[in-house]
Amino acid sequence: MNILFYDMGSYTYQDTLYYLKQLGHTCKTVYYHFPDKFHDDFFCDRFEKQLQSDSYDAVMSINFFPLIADLCHAHQIPYLAWCYDSPLEEKLEEYFSYDTNHIFLFDRIEAEYYQQLGYSQVQHLPLAVNTERLDKLQFSPAQIQKHRCDVSFIGHLYESPLQVLLYSADDYIKGYIEGILQAQLRVYGYYFIDELITDELLDSVNQSFRKVGQTSLTLNHRGLSFAIASEITNLERCFLLEQMGELFNTHFYTTKPHSLSDHVISLGPVKYMEEMPCVFRSSRLNLNPTLKSIQSGIPLRALDIMGSKGVLLSNFQPELVEYFEDGQDLILYSSMEEAVEKAAYYLQHDDIREQIAQNGYEKIKESFTYPDRIQKMLATI
């Protein structure tokens, strides 16, 4: 196939492009960074000219872009969007109904949600890892020593808007939402926040905005759900890092400032292609506290850890246990306290930990390959 690829610096672009070409497809890439992904006349003009300059069988991107969906629909060209972000921004849904769309989400529950709304163009497809590239990486003793630690986490602490949203709410509303938050914080594998956000609760929150003159702000169900999920994720990640930092040599790699204690060694960001695999391989345990609103799927971080022959210490995710066995291929926890307990145990058992790393890698190499995922996407056209 002749494929036009759009990219704005996504993590998985290079690996996807490599395997598209390995499978015999011709690819041309348009690079562009959207100031506003919903309105951009310059991009639309440039991209449309590119579409008209050749006979393309499909357009592809990592993550979904509404302007590309518009243009592909206008030209009746299939648009394949493979997403590693979840949950998707709510406004994107307005563009899902085009018959030219082929949207692939790694979270099965999120994909089923859109399918139940009638968007048959949305499908479930797990992410992939390029173990061929990772196997070729070689790290110097200095690089390994720099990143050698007991526990590491690459990511960020979510800045939830929840406290701002509830600033003008009465004590009952604040207490009710705090109860939801504390309950969900302790439950893994089942996301019940959506069930507890009633129309009456939303109406009360929105009335509290109007009482203080915020007439332009209206919060919907998904907005409040994501705010609560982000707050929970922030609390969980802070707790885990603080606890791990007090007990073990713990590294935290992030692009944003934070207020964690000095027990946690902050080393700033790392480059995805070159440095991140070294972190995963050099760390004795790699944390993966998943964003709470990712209800079932396996995030890219978890797959990259195992694909780099790192040991994954993750919260329970339904799709993880479909492919991997706890204590054999990875280490799962069902509470924050259990995460700390399991970290202490496995840090004392190097041989078990090393076997887990090898087993997880073999499962990734077998079941999470780019050729398989690409062929499944192209088969939908």
Predicted regions span which residues?
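Catalytic binding pocket for nucleotide-activated donors in carbohydrate/polymer assembly enzymes
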Residues: 4-7, 11-14, 18-23, 28-35, ...
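N-terminal pre-catalytic "stem/leader" segment of glycosyltransferase-like enzymes
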Residues: 1-75, 222-226, 250, 370, ...
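Histidine-centered beta-alpha loop that forms part of the nucleotide-sugar donor binding/catalytic region
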Residues: 64, 83-87, 108, 126-129, ...
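Nucleotide-sugar donor phosphate/pyrophosphate-binding loop at the beta->alpha transition
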Residues: 80-95, 105-106, 133-135, 220-221, ...
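Active-site proximal beta-strand in glycosyltransferases
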Residues: 72-87, 102-105, 127, 152
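Nucleotide-sugar donor-binding catalytic core of glycosyltransferases
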Residues: 2-12, 120-294, 318
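Short, conserved loop/helix-junction motifs that constitute active-site signature segments
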Residues: 73-74, 95-98, 144-146, 245
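Short acidic active-site motifs
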Residues: 46, 68, 91-92, 274-275, ...
